Amino acid sequence: MIVVNKEDCIRCGACQGTCPTAAIEVTPEDVIYCDICGGEPKCVDACPTGALKIEDLVVDEAGNTQGRIVFNPDKCNECGDCVEVCPPQILKLDEGKVKKIPLQGFCVMCQKCVDICPVGVIGVEGIKEPAKVELEIEGPIFIADCVGCGMCVPECPVDAITLEKVGGVIEIDEDTCIKCGVCAQTCPWNAVYISGKKPEKRAKEIRKFELDEEACIGCNTCVEACPGDFIVPKSSNLTVELPAICTACGLCEQLCPVDAIDLDVELGPAKPASEEGLVWDEGKCDFIGACANICPNDAIRVVTREGMKLPDNEKVDEEPSFAMCTRCGACTMACPKGALSLVDMDKVIDGEVVKRKRVQYNPALCDQCGDCIEACPYDMLKLTDEKVPLKGFCILCDQCIPACPKGALSLK
């Protein structure tokens, strides 16, 4: 069966793009895949018509075998029993669609995911162990094996990152950096580590990834530049083949000498990265939104499981999410008038009085230029028509903590 080292996975999604049966799904939080239930697939047992069965497949020259799931669509009555019992919930019926194969999500042991993984974290049990990344992260800012794609540079809210040359190595100004972690969450190759942590990845959608074959001259610059070897040369017509899904770092597009590659990537919002003051525990959050509704300054935004964006009470077609002001200070550095500042306030934590940062706003100094809104890495700030024209910054009032029924918010 397929095994995945999720901890070191860079969430590029190349495995998902190459899987012929949609048996692997990659999200910023997890990698969900068919592991054939350890050799005893529940879907096979549940199928009342015998449309699903397991058989052994020889996978190497030594004659070692692995189980694979075989699906016969002629026997399938689309009852959905297999979908109901699937532990990782990867099996799906394409109901209402005219398809020769109505069921997706079962592993046929083709090993295409193993072959395409750019960091080798997908393996086959007993045959090939998934790679493990051994890193000694040193200091609050740590850069390892940067490919020089520059994807993080425009995302930095305080312009602390520079890249002298595409394909080189980024530099981060430690005096300017506010440790918000947006660069680490954005980096498609897990090359940046802030505050000693492995980053949670941002959601990412490849809206366009196209090759102009008439413009392409077959120089293979993109093939040689791609850190993941995703691009395949086509010598027969002097072009290349782009992957269905990859890290979308953009090196190929930037280095193409004839501008034959067009890549458009939409990044999802950054996740709150804070270890002091108000801290969010993603594992406990149930995306109810009580915290967002009670916050007096709209410094928390929640999309509930029912698709309501709070506190705006707006129905949206989005996955459940949580965002908040982390008091990172990006807005205070961007404000040209000094209307925003980070100030210390006393807080009692575990019986001890400690200093914690809050955002302080002086509306008399604000000219409503919007520079702070542009700088906010979490897209929290907004201008209003009220007496206090700016909202979205955390004043550390703590009202959200008791409002959360799951205990997902706390002071640290």
Curated annotation (Swiss-Prot):
Q: Which cofactor does it need?
A: [4Fe-4S] cluster
Q: Name one Pfam family in it.
A: Fer4_3
Task: Tell me where the transmembrane regions lie.
Answer: none
Molecular function (GO) terms for this protein are:
4 iron, 4 sulfur cluster binding; electron transfer activity; iron ion binding; oxidoreductase activity
Per the annotation, how and in what number is the cofactor bound? Binds 12 [4Fe-4S] clusters.
Keyword Heme (UniProt):
no
**Name this polypeptide is given:** Polyferredoxin protein MvhB
Lineage of producing organism: Archaea, Methanobacteriati, Methanobacteriota, Methanomada group, Methanobacteria
The residues the record assigns to binding [4Fe-4S] cluster are 9, 12, 15, 19, 76, 79, 82, 86, 107, 110, 113, 117, 146, 149, 152, 156, 177, 180, 183, 187, 216, 219, 222, 226, 246, 249, 252, 256, 325, 328, 331, 335, 366, 369, 372, 376, 394, 397, 400, 404
- Give the top-rank taxon of the lineage listed in the UniProt record for this protein: Archaea
Name the source organism: Methanothermobacter marburgensis (strain ATCC BAA-927 / DSM 2133 / JCM 14651 / NBRC 100331 / OCM 82 / Marburg)
Q: Which gene encodes it?
A: mvhB
Ordered alphabetically, the record's keywords are: 4Fe-4S, Electron transport, Iron, Iron-sulfur, Metal-binding, Repeat, Transport
Domain 4Fe-4S ferredoxin-type stretches: 1-29, 30-57, 67-96, 97-127, 138-166, 168-197, 207-236, 238-266, 276-305, 314-345, 357-386, 385-412
